[in-house]
Design a protein with these regions (language model features):
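Surface-exposed, interaction-prone regions used to assemble/regulate multi-protein complexes
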Residues: 1-125
């Protein structure tokens, strides 16, 4: 994990219920899919994938947590059949994570990783 120290924050995203913490300068990568000839894309150097409980805390207050992926942003606006794993919906039909992570990503723009270690409990700090 020492390799990410000094890396600029790029963005937050998710793949179903997995947090993607995207760090580092953009690099060009070739992807074989979705077309047979593939395509080139600019992507962050690293994407750390977390499928465990996590949270972002600022001034002692949790501003985004793993449970936000499973909670509707506007619970009174969605029906009983609401599903957390659908993306691309209007904000009132999206998860708390999908709505709040974009603002957190904007606020973290320009930040860099100053330290990274695993605690005795396995937390990334």
């Amino acid at each position: 994990m020492e390799r990410v120290v000094g890396a600029p924050f790029h963005s937050l995203s998710r793949a179903v219920d997995m947090l993607c913490l995207n760090l580092g300068a953009e690099v060009e990568r070739h992807f074989e899919l979705p077309k047979p000839e593939g395509r080139d894309r600019r992507v962050p150097s690293w994407s750390i994938h977390l499928q465990t409980p996590w949270r972002f805390v600022h001034s002692g207050r949790t501003v985004l947590a793993s449970g936000d992926m499973y909670a509707p942003f506007a619970p009174d606006q969605v029906g009983e059949g609401w599903e957390y794993d659908l993306v691309g919906r209007p904000a009132v039909e999206s998860s708390r994570f999908d709505v709040l992570s974009t603002g957190l990503s904007r606020r973290m723009a320009g930040c860099t990783v100053t330290a990274c270690r695993a605690s005795p409990l396995g937390d990334l700090e």
